[in-house]
Amino acid sequence: MGKIINTAYPITTVNGIKVNTSKQCHSSNKENYSTRSIDYIVLHYTGKDTASANANYFTGANRQASAHYFVDDNSIYQSVELRDKAWHCGGSTYYHSHCRNTNSVGIEMCCTAGNY
């Protein structure tokens, strides 16, 4: 059984970096929930740009994807409330037998190739 999440922004600082919530994902790119059970953390590597630029992109409508967090070396943006479902690990095809958008938190690592 996973961690029950019923709050929007439980994390405010990570390693001295303030979590910025100013760039919220457009409502067409996520689903609202009042509570969720989290069993998995999904990490993706964007391969380009900054956390700010990626978070800004998802403020637009009809992107058909989203993530809870965008992270780079100097900043963290939370664009989807943790209690809500982001669309970060597939919709019609899943590659893991149990991990789904509904039971996971999506984190996008925003860095250029070779800058890990």
Predicted feature residues:
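Active-site-adjacent loop/helix surface patches within enzyme catalytic domains
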Residues: 2-116
